[in-house]
Amino acid sequence: MPAYRSRTSTHGRNMAGARGLWRATGMKNEDFGKPIIAVVNSFTQFVPGHVHLKDLGQLVAREIEKAGGVAKEFNTIAVDDGIAMGHDGMLYSLPSREIIADSVEYMVNAHCADAMVCISNCDKITPGMLMAALRLNVPAVFVSGGPMESGKVNVNGKIRSVDLIDAMVAAADDSVSDADVEAIERSACPTCGSCSGMFTANSMNCLTEALGLALPGNGSVLATHADRKGLFVEAGHLIVDLARRYYEQDDARVLPRAIASFKAFENAMTLDISMGGSTNTVLHLLAAAYEGEVPFTMKDIDRLSRRVPVLCKVAPSVVDVHLEDVHRAGGIMGILGELDRAGLIDSSLPTVHSTSLKDGLERWDIKRTKSDSVRSFYLAAPGGVRTQVAFSQDKRFEELDADRSSGCIRDAEHAFSKDGGLAVLYGNIARDGCIVKTAGVDDSILTFSGPARIFESQDAAVDAILTNRIQPGDVVLIRYEGPRGGPGMQEMLYPTSYLKSKGLGKQCALITDGRFSGGSSGLSIGHVSPEAAEGGAIGLVEEGDRIVFDIPNRKVHLDVSDAELERRRAAMEAKGDKAWKPAPRKRRVTMALKAYAAHATSAALGAVRVVKD
C-alpha cells in the first residue's frame, strides 16, 4: 500500500525543521496524519477567465478541510491569448504551457503533496495543468472557472449574441462604423469567464469531462451562475476521498493515468471532433498523452476524424450559439450521451465522479436522467448583468433544449455533417500531418487550390491582407512560425479574421506551421509538420507554387515534382548556418524563448519539449 507522500516531510525526528515550517503555515499536530492537498490556482487580474478565481481557491480549501484533508494553495501564471494576440506577446503563449506544467511539478514534488485540485480556465492553463497531472500521477480533480456569458448587441433592431471574434472582425471591416465597432467591443465580453464560444479554453475544459478528470458541467455551466459553486464544493470533498482511496485502500484506479487512458483520450478526441473544438486541442491532447506515456498520436486522430460526425456547432463555426446554449441542451454529458448511443465512445471507463462514464451518463445525460435536480442544473441561464463576480447570477431558462433533430446538440441520425469537425491532412508539404477545423469550413471550399503567397511572419501576412494585396483564390502561406521557428508557434487569429473582414473567408486558404486561435474559422490549415525550421517542405515553397487542398480525402499537396523539391532542398542546405531560417524580421527572441525553442518539437508531437538524457 503506498504511503502518503506528505509523510516524507511530516514524519520522523529528522523532519522537526520541516514540521516547524508546516506549523508556521497553520498546521497542528492532528494535521500531520491527514492528506495534504495542493490547491493549484491560476488567479490573475490580467485575464477575464481568471479574475474571479481569487476566492475560489480558498473555497475549495475550506471544503477539503471539512472533508478531513489539509489544503495548501499556490498559483500558476496565466497568459491571456486574446490580449497577447497580434504582437510579440503571442510568442510566450504556448511556451507558458510548459512553464505551468513545470511549476505545478515543482510545487507538488518539492512539498510532497498527496493530491491536487486544479483550478484552471483559459487557453494554456488547463493544458499545462493537465500535463502536470499526468506527469505526476497523483490523485487530481479539475474544476475550471467556467465560460463567460455571450455578449448581446442590437443589430438592425434585432438582439444578437456576440463574442470577442465579432469585435475583431468588425474592427477590420471598413464598412462598419466606428460607433458600431465600439458597441460590439463593449458588448463582446460582458462577464468574467473564458470567452463564450467553442474556443480553445472552453474546448479544453469540455475535454476534461470526457477524459474523466472533471465533474459534469465543468465545461459548460457559466462562470457567473450560482450552480457553478457546487462544482468547487464537490471537488474539495471528492479529492480527499480519492486520496484516501489511493493511499489507504491501494486503489490505483483513481490515479490520472488510470482514468486518462488511451481509450479515454479516444473519447476526448471523439468529443472534440463531434463539437468542432479548437484545433489547439489536438496540440494539447498530444502533449498530455506524451506526459502520461499514452501512445496516442496524430494517426489516431486521423482515424477518429473519419468516423465521428458533427453533433454540435458553436461559435465561431456558427453565429449566435455559445456555451450557454450548449449547457441548456445538456452540456458535455449531453453530447457524450449521443456519442454513446451511436456506439462511438467507450463508456465503460472510470471517471473521478463515477465508477464508469456510463454510470455518470445515467444521472447526467438529460435524455436518460430521472433527476429533477440535474434537469434544473442544465437550465442555468445567463444573468445578462455585466459582472466579474463568480456565482452572482441565478436565472434559469424556462425549458431545456432536448431537441436532438434540430437543436443545439444533435443525435447521430440528424448530425450537422457525417464528417467530423476536425481533420488531419497529409501530403508532400506536411509529411507528418496538419490540422483543419472542418466545422468552420464552408462546403464550397472543401476542395480548393490556388497560388501560394509566401510570408515569413504573421505580421507580413497581416499587412498584405489589410493593404488588399491578397486576391480571391490565393493561398496565404505563413512559415517559420512553428514551435521552434517562431519560436512559440503563434496563433494566426488576426490573419483569419482579417480575411473574413475583407470578404475573402470563403475565397482564400491559409496554411501555416503556426497554429490558430480557437476563434479561427475558414479554410485555415495549421500545425504543418515538420515545420520550416525543422527542415519541413513548407520551407521550400516558392511564390506562385500551386497548393491543392482536398479535405474529403484528407490530402494537401504542393504541386511541385519530387525532383524539383530535392533540388530546392539541396540549395537550402547549401546555405549552411543560414538554412531553414526566415528572412530578416523584427522580432526580439529572449533567452527564455530560446530555451524553449532549443527543445521544442513540431506540432505532430504536441510541441512538447524533448530533453535527451
From Swiss-Prot:
One of its GO terms (cellular component) is cytosol. Its EC number is 4.2.1.9. Binds 1 [2Fe-2S] cluster per subunit. This cluster acts as a Lewis acid cofactor. Its cofactor is [2Fe-2S] cluster; Mg(2+). [2Fe-2S] cluster binds at residues 122, 195. It comes from the Bacteria. GO terms for molecular function: 2 iron, 2 sulfur cluster binding; dihydroxy-acid dehydratase activity; magnesium ion binding. GO terms for biological process: isoleucine biosynthetic process; L-valine biosynthetic process. The active site is at 517 (proton acceptor). It catalyses: (2R)-2,3-dihydroxy-3-methylbutanoate = 3-methyl-2-oxobutanoate + H2O; (2R,3R)-2,3-dihydroxy-3-methylpentanoate = (S)-3-methyl-2-oxopentanoate + H2O. Mg(2+) binds at residues 81, 123-124, 491. Pathway: Amino-acid biosynthesis; L-isoleucine biosynthesis; L-isoleucine from 2-oxobutanoate: step 3/4; Amino-acid biosynthesis; L-valine biosynthesis; L-valine from pyruvate: step 3/4. Gene3D superfamilies: IlvD/EDD C-terminal domain-like. It holds the Pfam family ILVD_EDD_N. The modification N6-carboxylysine is found at residue 124. The keyword Phosphoprotein does not apply. Keywords: 2Fe-2S, Amino-acid biosynthesis, Branched-chain amino acid biosynthesis, Iron, Iron-sulfur, Lyase, Magnesium, Metal-binding. The keyword Glycosyltransferase does not apply. Homodimer. Belongs to the IlvD/Edd family. PANTHER family: D-XYLONATE DEHYDRATASE, D-XYLONATE DEHYDRATASE YAGF-RELATED. Functions in the biosynthesis of branched-chain amino acids. Catalyzes the dehydration of (2R,3R)-2,3-dihydroxy-3-methylpentanoate (2,3-dihydroxy-3-methylvalerate) into 2-oxo-3-methylpentanoate (2-oxo-3-methylvalerate) and of (2R)-2,3-dihydroxy-3-methylbutanoate (2,3-dihydroxyisovalerate) into 2-oxo-3-methylbutanoate (2-oxoisovalerate), the penultimate precursor to L-isoleucine and L-valine, respectively. NCBIfam families: ilvD, PRK12448.1. This is Dihydroxy-acid dehydratase. The lineage of its organism: Bacteria, Pseudomonadati, Pseudomonadota, Alphaproteobacteria, Hyphomicrobiales. The gene is ilvD.
